[in-house]
């Protein structure tokens, strides 16, 4: 029985030949991957087959590589994964990192000071500071989320005060140049704020009493970007990768740190519905370009 089953188990490895993992180059890093030999060995042992890392110049190139099948596995930002999903419908998230404090992602918040904006319905009659257009929590999430809730808001809404940076938007609230601002907060997998960072804490650190600050609205959670595989990858390969990645932090933390330097809490399983917020942003962006 065992000898008959072994060739079948090996079929997916034979079909793939070399398992290719795509990552985006670090700024100024060229094609170098810190700890490449250790990472390659770790994935090779997990899959029981030859593994190669492919370094893409940017997420657009990485998306194209996975959509075309040149790589089977890719490490994405949330919006890059959503873009890949829209591009080909051929990818699925496997795992995503969390922070040491349990945060699994972020959400946008609308913050007011001293009750200047009484509620969300009054927003349009006040001055609201908003971050630049490439800022996810300070621009993309509020415009996408509020529009999805039926609130009249657009990039050129007259009540929006466009700040040159997220920090500048915070300063505008602190100096009284704005009655509210769109910021962010970290959120756990349960959808609750972890109270371990974000705009309110930054404003408090800048000298604004926390008791004077109020959150009027929160967006849906944007989960941290996933490691995603092609949907047509063999189920056994997906299982092996999931077991390897979800145990990586506890078993070989040094390898985990090489693979994920921004979020130190380990990997947890992820599913497509975790990225509905990211998909909404990508679709909103696409609609604006048409």
Report residues per predicted region.
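A structural signal for short loop-to-beta-strand junctions that line the ligand-binding cleft
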Residues: 90-103, 212-218
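Pocket-lining segment of extracytoplasmic ligand-binding domains
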Residues: 127-234
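Extracytoplasmic small-molecule ligand-binding "clamshell" domains
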Residues: 10-82
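A bilobed periplasmic-binding-protein/Venus flytrap-type ligand-binding module shared by bacterial periplasmic
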Residues: 24-25, 107-117, 219-236
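Short, Asp-centered acidic motifs that coordinate Mg2+ and/or phosphate
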Residues: 72-73, 93, 179-180
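An extracytoplasmic/periplasmic, membrane-proximal ligand-sensing/linker region
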Residues: 12-38, 229-290
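Flexible hinge/capping segments at coil-to-helix
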Residues: 111-132
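C-terminal segment of classical bacterial N-terminal signal peptides
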Residues: 2-9
């Amino acid at each position: 029985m065992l000898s008959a089953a072994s060739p079948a188990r090996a079929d997916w490895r034979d079909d793939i030949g070399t398992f290719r993992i795509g990552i985006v180059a670090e700024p100024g890093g060229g094609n170098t991957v810190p700890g490449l030999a250790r990472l390659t060995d770790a994935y090779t042992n997990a899959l029981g087959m030859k593994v190669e890392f492919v370094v893409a110049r940017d997420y657009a190139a990485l998306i194209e590589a996975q959509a075309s099948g040149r790589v089977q596995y890719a490490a994405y930002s949330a919006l890059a994964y959503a873009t890949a999903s829209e591009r080909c419908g051929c990818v699925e998230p496997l795992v995503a990192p969390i922070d040491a404090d349990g945060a699994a992602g972020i959400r946008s918040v609308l913050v007011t000071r001293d009750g200047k904006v009484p509620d969300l319905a009054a927003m349009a009659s006040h001055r609201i500071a908003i971050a630049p257009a490439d800022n996810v929590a300070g621009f993309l999430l509020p415009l996408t989320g509020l529009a999805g809730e039926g609130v009249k808001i657009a990039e050129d809404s007259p009540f929006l005060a466009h700040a040159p940076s997220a920090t500048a938007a915070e300063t505008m609230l602190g100096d009284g140049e704005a009655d509210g601002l769109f910021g962010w907060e970290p959120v756990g997998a349960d959808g609750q704020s972890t109270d371990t960072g974000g705009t309110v804490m930054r404003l408090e650190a800048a000298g604004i009493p926390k008791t004077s600050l109020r959150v009027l609205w929160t967006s849906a959670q944007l989960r941290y970007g996933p490691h995603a595989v092609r949907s047509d990858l063999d189920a056994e390969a997906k299982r092996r990768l999931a077991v390897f990645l979800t145990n990586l932090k506890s078993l070989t933390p040094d390898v985990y740190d090489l693979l994920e330097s921004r979020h130190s809490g380990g990997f947890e399983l992820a599913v497509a519905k975790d990225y509905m917020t990211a998909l909404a942003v990508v679709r909103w962006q696409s609609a604006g370009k048409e």
